[in-house]
Amino acid sequence: MAVSKEEILETISNMTVMEVVELIEEMEEKFGVTAAAAVAAAPAAAGGEAEAAEEQTEFDVVLSSFGSNKVAVIKAVRGITGLGLKEAKEVVEGAPSPIKEGASKEEAEEIKAKLEEAGASVEVK
């Protein structure tokens, strides 16, 4: 007389928590396995998939090139970053250069628009 999976599950669902714990311990001893390893591995796999599905929240704005109007781009970089003239000029001339790291999507888009308006090529990563 074979017992079906449904009957086993029905029996387990009628047990108390302590009885289920004892059953698991006995199964671990009988079959030489541990339930903790399987339980610990499952959430890690699910968590990795969930992180990949989440939308990116932090963006880096990178100045690719300053284009034909370097002076306007330097002014825009100074306004965005608060750098001095010399530092802003070094950032612009050293393109590709990060302008802002860890910015929100809205902030990154605003910075990109300001720099492109000044004539620069900009990437948001």
From Swiss-Prot:
Keywords: Ribonucleoprotein, Ribosomal protein. GO terms for biological process: translation. Belongs to the bacterial ribosomal protein bL12 family. The keyword Cytoplasm does not apply. Forms part of the ribosomal stalk which helps the ribosome interact with GTP-bound translation factors. Is thus essential for accurate translation. It comes from the Bacteria. Signal peptide: none annotated. NCBIfam families: L12. Homodimer. Part of the ribosomal stalk of the 50S ribosomal subunit. Forms a multimeric L10(L12)X complex, where L10 forms an elongated spine to which 2 to 4 L12 dimers bind in a sequential fashion. Binds GTP-bound translation factors. InterPro entries: Ribosomal_bL12, Ribosomal_bL12_C, Ribosomal_bL12_C/ClpS-like, Ribosomal_bL12_oligo, Ribosomal_bL12_oligo_N_sf. One of its GO terms (cellular component) is cytosolic large ribosomal subunit. This is Large ribosomal subunit protein bL12. PANTHER family: 39S RIBOSOMAL PROTEIN L12, LARGE RIBOSOMAL SUBUNIT PROTEIN BL12M. One of its GO terms (molecular function) is structural constituent of ribosome.
